[in-house]
Amino acid sequence: GNASGSDLGGLWTGSAMPFGSLVGFSESHDEERTAYKSLSEGVSSVKNSLKARMQRESLCGAFLLCVPGPKMLWQFQELGYDVIIDEGGRTGRKPVHWEYLDDPDRKRLHDDYRTILKFRNDNPEFFDESASVSLKVGTSSWNNGKTISISASGKSFILVGNFNTSDS
C-alpha cells in the first residue's frame, strides 16, 4: 500500500471536459503496472504473497471500474500482469502468460473483473452522467477506507475498500 498519489477523484471530477471525454485507467504504456509495483515496491506482506497482490489488484479494479465514465484496461491487467512495462520497450511486445489463468489467485482476479464488468453492463444507469455520485477516495481516506456511493433510477450501491496494508 502506498497512500502517496492514491487519490482517485480525478477519475470523476476536476475537469472542465464534458462527461465521457476522459478515459480512466490505472496503467498503460506510460504508467507502470500496478501488479508490478506491488511485487517490486510493496510491503513484505504484500510483495511476498501472490494471493495478497491479486486481492489488492481486484480491489483496485473494482474502484477503477465502479467510477462512472469510460475506462481502459491495459494488456492483461485483469490477470495481474506483473511484467515491468520496459520489457521489450514501453510499446514493444510483451510476453503473454496464459498460464496465469491456471493459478487460482489470478483466475479469481480475472473472474472479479468479469463480475464487475457484467455489473456495469447490467446497470448502465449507475455509470452515466445522470447518476448521483459520492466519492471518498482521496489520500486522506487511506487509513479509514475509500468509498464510492452511487444512486440512479431508484437503485444504489456502495463500494468500500481498505487500501491500507493493515486490517484496520
Predicted regions and their residues:
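Short, contiguous acidic/charged loop-to-helix segments that flank catalytic cores in large enzymes
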Residues: S45-A52, H97-K107
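Catalytic cores of secreted or luminal carbohydrate-active enzymes
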Residues: E99-D128
